[in-house]
Every structure is written in structure tokens, then in C-alpha cells.
């Protein structure tokens, strides 16, 4: 078998070339920021070099490879915003407490904890802004402890150096032709639809419960991943606006198909009914591609249109959602203008955003950052160590950035190992290589670029300590103007980094996050609220699309409780009940409308209750109200198709009352 040559067209499309391209991109960004920093006579070009390295390498470490187009630009813009917020916060704190340095440092620790708390509540994409704002304030205040009157000048210099580093990272990203995510979006849409059809086949054939669980579990993750790709596509270019709108609705259609397929399975399990031979003939045919599914959905649509008797309503709904999916997927592939039919689909529902269910988790994160920085501050003040400020800054950086991740301990370990690796690597650069390049700017750039190139390759492999080593090595190198080489200062800074990361890891380990059970219960009660909120006669409320918010909470549940299949099933049943109750033909009636509002208010009290006894009391009240509501529907002489789903929901809540209320 012939291997592709380095000059052949095949090599330029391989993952190996993408890794090499990113390593060159990272080296170019660092070298350019270093050269411009010295050329523009900046006081500390190290900050521009460090910024370029973090902005370029951070998304690559998160992605496990070269980031998609737009990711580095987005990261850079977030860093600009976070830096300005941090500078403003530092100026306000210094002006208010300039005569009380200890109070100033304590306020700075509280500010860092507050920013971490906010970053844990906002979207993951925007959390970087607030984490950065917290430790930027700390850096400025710590760096100007001896000369507070120079704070405005220092803040302006830091902002200038950071903006220069961001500009260099963005220029490098543009010059080295970042890869577009569009092809991955098109491929993922096709694979997702094929998997959706296979889940329907499993549901109609009465497969094992474990097989169904594994299938819909994987589909939820793939649908969430496609939604994340949509965000990356918008970062790439504004020309994808129409595709973005289609992908938003396509996300809803995918979730609808998962729900309808699982409901079909439950319906057939409760009341097994033979499937029409014509439908069975189509459903039994295997599918391998997007085109195969298109043909099967078209055949199912024709069969249902010809004779819809004995066809499960959930199957009809699934085919309708699949038809809309196919329509939108074609529009995404072409990125053409939105047609009238597509506009009707896009405007048919109003998506509802879900509030954060991790408020207690966010408080723990803020407490960790505040306590860790306060301990670092006390350590610095009590010892008088010259590099105590470096230790304190590293504590703030690690705790601020690690808290938003699913595994903060692993992030802290990455920084700790990185600072340990940075000691010998930095010593090699500082003691031998950099002093030999003092007469040549070219040699200095080449040496730093070579180091960045090899570390860039390791960062893409998500090697433990690689990202921390890159940032820590640059941080302890004296890239100032003019450059000085003091061994004691270098060792103090290197050891200060290690101690700071170690203290941050100890705080994360000692202040345990015991909010997991609370978050899980809150999420499950949000599903209960989502189910009962579907009971309404208000046409505006009926158009509200809660499905993306409910599945977003389900995805969070999957991440927080990766092995608790019982929680997943309960959550999925409640989502199915939401969809079923949403389609009920409830007549306009003032008494029923008032009861709907009362049920929603009680369900909200279940979520807000802080004590188990209070929550249990409101939950019992909710069950009583649902039973009374079912009686009211019966008194209205409504058919069983309306009253039975309410009874089914009441039965589910009664069976799981202990898990939902205690």
C-alpha cells in the first residue's frame, strides 16, 4: 500500500497535516507578538506573548485538535471584554480602598469569587469572560501593591499588550487557513437522521429496553453535539445566518423524533398492536445513508396518507418531524434563501430558554475561588515572600478557569503538572538558550517558536500538563524590555507557580461539591414542571417550545449522573408526557384555565422549596390537584384520549414521589 507523499493533495486533508498546521499557527502567533512587542517598545512583551499562546492553544486543547474557524477569534474577543471588565474592577477597588491594602486584597478575593460564581451560571461559551475578569483584577492589584498611583498606567499597558497578543493570534488563525466546520455539520446531519430512523425501527420492533436506552442516549448526545456545531458555524462567518436558523429548528425536530420514537415504544409495550404489513415492510428495510432514509420517509408518508387507520399517532408525528428535518437539512446544505414553507416551520414555535439548575454548584465554585485566593493572600502577607504574588495569581487563574469545567480537579492537575514541567524547560530556555540569543532577535524568535511548535503538538493530544506547561513556561521567562537574567527571580517565580497550583488543587479537594443530589432533584422537578406546564388552553402558551430546554436539562443530567439509567428514564418519560399533554384538545373553559395556573404555581413551589418537608408538602398538593383536574375533565365529558394522559402523569409522579420530593 502506497503512503501519501508530503506534496500530494491527500496529505493536506489528513489529521496529521491539520496538527502540523496548528503548531505552525501557534508558533507564528507567539513569534509575531514577541517581535511586535519589542518593536513597539512595550514594557513587558511577555503579556502579549502569553495572551497569544493562551488564545490560540486554549480552543485546541478543548477540541483535542485544530479548532474550527472562528473559535480563536471568539476566544480573543471574550478575552478583550474580560480584560476590560477586570481593569475597571481593579480601578474601582483601588480608588475605594487605597489607604487599606489588606482590605483591598480581601475585596479582590471576594471579586474573584463573585466572577467565578457568575461564570458558573452563564453559558459555557461566555463563562471565560467572567473568569478572566476575576483574575485580571487580581493581577493588576497585586502587581501595583507598592505603587497604587500607577494603577491607571499599568492597566492601560496591560490592555495594550493583551490586545496585541489577541490580534496576533487572530492574524495567525486567518493566515493559516483554519478549517471550516460546514462539512462536519453536513455529515453529522446525515448520520443523525440515519440513527433516528434506526431508533424508530428498534421501537417498532419491540427491542430490549437496554438497547432502546443506549440508542436514545447516544442520539441525545449527537443532537447536542450538532447544536454545538451550529454555534461554531456562526462564529465562522455571518454568511451562515440562514443555516443557523435552520439548524436551530432542526435541533427541535431531532428532539421531537427521539421523543416520538420512545413514546411509540412505550405505547406498543403497554398495548401491543400488530403493525400493518405495508408499514412493517418499509420499516424492516435497513438504511445506510441519508438518501436511504429520505426514500423510507417518503414511502411512509405515502402509506399514511393513503390509509392512516391503525397507524400509531406517534408514528405519524415522527414522520412529520422527519419530513421537516429533511426539508431543513437540504436548506442547510445549500445555504440558500429561506423559502415560504421553511419560514412557516421556523416561525411555528417560540423556543423557551431554561434557567440554570446549578445555582448551588455555582455558589460552591465561587466559594472555592474566594477561599483559595484569600489563603494565597494570607500566605503572601505572612511570609513576605517576594514571589508570593505569583503564587496568588496562579491560585486565582486555576480556580477561575477550572470551576466551569465538568472535572475541575483534572484541570487543576493539568496546571500543576504543567508548572512542574515548566521548571526544567524554562530553566533550559532561561539559563542557556535565551542568553545566547541576546545579539539576535531572529535567534530569540526561532528558539521560542521551536518550543511553541512542539508544545503545540502536545496540546492537541490533550496531554496532561501540556497547556499548563506552555503558559507557565512563557510566564516565568523574562520577556521584558530590557531583558534581565536573575536566577533567583526565575526560581522564585517557578516555585511560586507550583505552590500556587498545589494550593488551588488542595482547596478544590477540601471544599467538596456536595450539590450533586440537589442539582439532580432540581432537574427532575424541572421536568415535572415542564410536563404540567403543557396543560393550557392558551394558544400562545401552546406555541412555546419547551423541548430544547428540557433536553438541555436531560443532557446536564446525563453528565452529572453518567451511570444512573433510572433518572434518565424518568426524565424521558416526563418529556414524553410533556409532548403528549401539549397535543391534548382541551376546550376553552375559565375554570380549567384557573386550575392550569394553580397547577403550574404549585409545581414551581416544588422547585423553589429549600426544605424536604416543604417540598414533600407541595408535591403532595400537586398530586391532589392533578387528581382533581382529571375529575374535572371527566365531569366535562371529555374523551379518554384527554383524561387518560393526565392519569398517566399522575401515576408516574406518584410512583416516583420519593425520588422527586426527598
Curated annotation (Swiss-Prot):
Record InterPro entries: PHBA_efflux_AaeB/fusaric-R, PHBA_efflux_pump_AaeB
Q: Does the keyword Transmembrane apply?
A: yes
- CC annotations in GO: plasma membrane
The UniProt entry lists membrane topology as: Multi-pass membrane protein
Q: One Pfam family name from the record?
A: FUSC
Q: Where is coiled-coil annotated? A: none
**Keywords of this protein's UniProt record, alphabetized?**
Cell inner membrane, Cell membrane, Membrane, Transmembrane, Transmembrane helix, Transport
Q: Which chain regions cross the lipid bilayer?
A: 22-42, 52-72, 76-96, 102-122, 129-149, 161-181, 378-398, 415-435, 439-459, 467-487, 491-511
Query: What residue range is the signal peptide?
Result: none
Query: What's the domain of life for this entry?
Result: Bacteria
**Which Gene Ontology BP terms does the record give?**
carboxylic acid transport
* Compartments reported by the entry: Cell inner membrane
- Please give the Gene Ontology molecular function terms for this protein: transmembrane transporter activity
In its keyword annotation, does this UniProt entry include Cell inner membrane? yes
State what this protein does: Forms an efflux pump with AaeA. Could function as a metabolic relief valve, allowing to eliminate certain compounds when they accumulate to high levels in the cell.
Q: Which family does it belong to?
A: Belongs to the aromatic acid exporter ArAE (TC 2.A.85) family.
What NCBIfam families does the annotation carry? PRK10631.1
Q: Quote the protein name from its UniProt record.
A: p-hydroxybenzoic acid efflux pump subunit AaeB
Q: What is the lineage of its organism?
A: Bacteria, Pseudomonadati, Pseudomonadota, Gammaproteobacteria, Enterobacterales
